Amino acid sequence: MTLATPAHKRILLKLSGEALMGDDAFGINRATIVRMVEEIAEVTRLGVQVAVVIGGGNIFRGVAGGSVGMDRATADYMGMLATVMNALALADAMDKQGLTARVMSAIGIEQVVEPYVRPKALQYLEEGKVVVFAAGTGNPFFTTDTAAALRGAEIGAEVVLKATKVDGVYTADPMKDPSATRYAKLTFDEAMSRNLGILDATAFALCRDQKLPIRVFSIVKHGALKRVVMGEDEGTLVYA
């Protein structure tokens, strides 16, 4: 029996901070992280190189901080530090699962994690290590979605996988409209004209210009990540 070959050799997985909360209202739910890491371990065993960009919304959201009187740049830097905390938690869970993880930060915090250096990140991926990119782009006013698009382009990822709580992009909010249907695939232009809000505008434009496909899928759905990596009809593909 021939084992199926993954459709992608190198992926960039975008995880929101909120995804780490599980059913909690705040913070990091250990059981949720362990389950996510098991899904990631499953695809690394297939020989897929995995890089992760993690958000920080479960701890602090820069946008929210800025909206209540805090200086926006300061709030964004706090958000970046929140992503470092999440990245450390994720890497710790990976190490306990038998994966080798390396956290690389876009801001200097050398006693805790190593700085992001592109050739080093590529070397880690080639060695089969999981690279977790922390601190977004290192700049205020840029989201972690934009960091995912940027790092995806930099490392030559074949696809950006945006992990959400919904299994793809729908014609309407499936939680509110039972008749909403899932798009199997969309072009970048179609997604823009329908104003579907898949990524923020900067991230979306970067992916479109670099012809870097995006696949939106549910991280809550067991086995969905593996199905995506194997090229099965899972989630929604946005392509050039």
Curated annotation (Swiss-Prot):
<keyword id="KW-0067">ATP-binding</keyword>
<keyword id="KW-0547">Nucleotide-binding</keyword>
<dbReference type="InterPro" id="IPR015963">
    <property type="entry name" value="Uridylate_kinase_bac"/>
</dbReference>
<feature type="binding site">
    <location>
        <position position="170"/>
    </location>
    <ligand>
        <name>ATP</name>
    </ligand>
</feature>
<keyword id="KW-0963">Cytoplasm</keyword>
<dbReference type="Pfam" id="PF00696">
    <property type="entry name" value="AA_kinase"/>
</dbReference>
<feature type="binding site">
    <location>
        <position position="61"/>
    </location>
    <ligand>
        <name>ATP</name>
    </ligand>
</feature>
<dbReference type="GO" id="GO:0005829">
    <property type="term" value="C:cytosol"/>
</dbReference>
<keyword id="KW-0808">Transferase</keyword>
<keyword id="KW-0665">Pyrimidine biosynthesis</keyword>
<feature type="binding site">
    <location>
        <position position="57"/>
    </location>
    <ligand>
        <name>ATP</name>
    </ligand>
</feature>
<comment type="function">
    <text>Catalyzes the reversible phosphorylation of UMP to UDP.</text>
</comment>
<keyword id="KW-0418">Kinase</keyword>
<feature type="binding site">
    <location>
        <position position="164"/>
    </location>
    <ligand>
        <name>ATP</name>
    </ligand>
</feature>
<feature type="binding site">
    <location>
        <begin position="14"/>
        <end position="17"/>
    </location>
    <ligand>
        <name>ATP</name>
    </ligand>
</feature>
<dbReference type="GO" id="GO:0006225">
    <property type="term" value="P:UDP biosynthetic process"/>
</dbReference>
<dbReference type="GO" id="GO:0033862">
    <property type="term" value="F:UMP kinase activity"/>
</dbReference>
<comment type="pathway">
    <text>Pyrimidine metabolism; CTP biosynthesis via de novo pathway; UDP from UMP (UMPK route): step 1/1.</text>
</comment>
<feature type="binding site">
    <location>
        <position position="173"/>
    </location>
    <ligand>
        <name>ATP</name>
    </ligand>
</feature>
<dbReference type="GO" id="GO:0044210">
    <property type="term" value="P:'de novo' CTP biosynthetic process"/>
</dbReference>
<dbReference type="InterPro" id="IPR001048">
    <property type="entry name" value="Asp/Glu/Uridylate_kinase"/>
</dbReference>
<feature type="binding site">
    <location>
        <position position="76"/>
    </location>
    <ligand>
        <name>UMP</name>
    </ligand>
</feature>
<comment type="similarity">
    <text>Belongs to the UMP kinase family.</text>
</comment>
<dbReference type="InterPro" id="IPR011817">
    <property type="entry name" value="Uridylate_kinase"/>
</dbReference>
<comment type="subunit">
    <text>Homohexamer.</text>
</comment>
<feature type="binding site">
    <location>
        <begin position="137"/>
        <end position="144"/>
    </location>
    <ligand>
        <name>UMP</name>
    </ligand>
</feature>
<dbReference type="GO" id="GO:0005524">
    <property type="term" value="F:ATP binding"/>
</dbReference>
<protein>
    <recommendedName>
        <fullName>Uridylate kinase</fullName>
        <ecNumber>2.7.4.22</ecNumber>
    </recommendedName>
</protein>
<feature type="binding site">
    <location>
        <position position="56"/>
    </location>
    <ligand>
        <name>UMP</name>
    </ligand>
</feature>
<dbReference type="InterPro" id="IPR036393">
    <property type="entry name" value="AceGlu_kinase-like_sf"/>
</dbReference>
